[in-house]
């Protein structure tokens, strides 16, 4: 699944 690496950046 996708996860957020940063406040506005999802990997």
Swiss-Prot record:
A single GO molecular function term of this UniProt record: toxin activity
Key word Translocase present: no
Record key words, sorted: Bromination, Disulfide bond, Secreted, Toxin
Residues where 6'-bromotryptophan is found: 3
Location in the cell: Secreted
Domain of life: Eukaryota
One GO CC term on file: extracellular region
Tissue distribution of the protein: Expressed by the venom duct.
Disulphide connectivity of cysteines: 4-10, 5-11
Keyword DNA-binding among UniProt keywords: no
Domain comment as written in the entry: The cysteine framework is V (CC-CC).
Similarity remark: Belongs to the conotoxin T superfamily.
Identification of the protein by name: Conotoxin Mo1274
Species for this entry: Conus monile
